[in-house]
Amino acid sequence: KGDQLYIGLVGNVDLYSEDFDTHVAHLARDRRFVGVRARGSKPIDFSHDLVLANLNMLAQRKLTMDYLTNGGGIPGIQTADKLARSIPGLTIVIDHCLGYDFDGKEPDEDWISAVESLASNQNVYCKISGLYQRCTIQPAVQNLGHYRMVLDVLWKHFGAERLIYGSNWPCTKHSGSYASFLQLVDSWISPKGQAAREAYYWQNAAAAYRLPLK
């Protein structure tokens, strides 16, 4: 409270809680509370009536849901796709490049098709984060070529307006340095022009989380 070093915070609120809206309402008294990260002690069933009711409440409050598909592969993407279609008013930010395991190989066509379907939902954003953590080689490869094919698929389908920069700090320092990660992603986005850089680094986040930035 009173700390102006951050302008937005995504919180943890149990999606299975009967008091979900009460907790969210309390947190939302601080306008820097911008949404909820879908996580918990057990896997979340996004077809569960209470979970869906709580996410509808989140949408009505114009708050965002962060979603982790880590390890979920194509089924995880399809779950997010179905959710985005069932609650079109809910803004969803999917973290860590949709949970892709970066092995340096060309992504599978089935994965690309799942991404294309997901990205057709205009209420879904993709966060370019966690590259080092999701690299199958550790310490992580610090060469853009290892990641480019996947990043290019995300760019093709989400476009300049729905990709968001994420540092994943401090986790990044366990697999590589923050400086090298920033240099890597900047070498990917910079050739697309300054407008794309501005969108990627802050404007898209401002839109997704409704931040007071101009």
Q: Positions of the model-derived regions?
A:
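Short beta-strand segments
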Residues: V10-D14, K127-G130, I164-G166, Y201-W202
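Active-site metal-binding loops of divalent metal-dependent hydrolases
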Residues: V13, G40, C97, N168-W169
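Mid-to-C-terminal alpha-helical segments outside catalytic/metal-binding sites
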Residues: D152-V153, H157-I164, K173-K214
